[in-house]
């Protein structure tokens, strides 16, 4: 599509020189580019939580989940939003035992409540398990997996072990 539409892809830090010129700084140095229109795609990054140190090996973001070399036997998805549920659904179909932990009392809070309930039923039929109204209070990665401590809304604490933890509480 880029070639067909005569679009040049650039990567680096950019700033506007004027309305039709940008200066791009990259590992190759600085260079000015002129055009009638520019598309600026800054991308996004996963929201971090201090108690959950991401290493992209055992505790991963959606980016790391796509780079896993093998299907984990068990996967905990932290966050019941669109990205985490999509990733969880895929890994479940590939053979992973997937559990989703969500701090709220339902998944995908921006979705209509009735539709979200039906969506959750569908995901349960695929084999996903849910821990709603639970929050992760700590994680500890080790050779045999990740130990995850969670607390329910009634302050009961549980600790479980997973091969991989997917941190999916949002992007910024």
Where are these regions (language model features)?
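FAD-binding core/adjacent interface of flavoenzyme oxidoreductases
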Residues: 1-78, 149-172
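Rossmann-like dinucleotide-binding cores of NAD(P)H-dependent redox enzymes
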Residues: 66-67, 72-76, 82-157
């Amino acid at each position: 599509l880029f070639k067909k539409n005569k679009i040049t892809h650039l990567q680096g830090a950019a700033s506007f020189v004027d309305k039709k010129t940008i200066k791009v700084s990259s590992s190759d140095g600085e260079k000015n580019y002129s055009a009638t229109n520019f598309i600026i795609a800054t991308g996004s990054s996963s929201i971090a939580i201090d108690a959950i140190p991401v290493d992209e090996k055992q505790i991963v973001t959606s980016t790391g989940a796509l780079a896993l070399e093998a299907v984990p036997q068990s996967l905990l998805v932290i966050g019941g939003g669109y990205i985490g549920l999509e990733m969880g659904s895929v890994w479940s179909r590939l053979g992973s035992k997937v559990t989703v932990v969500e701090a709220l009392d339902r998944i995908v809070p921006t979705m209509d409540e009735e539709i979200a309930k039906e969506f959750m039923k569908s995901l349960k039929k695929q084999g996903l398990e849910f821990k709603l109204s639970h929050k992760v209070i700590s994680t500890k990665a080790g050779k045999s997996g990740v130990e995850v401590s969670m607390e329910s809304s009634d302050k009961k604490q549980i600790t479980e072990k997973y091969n991989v933890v997917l941190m999916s509480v949002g992007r910024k």
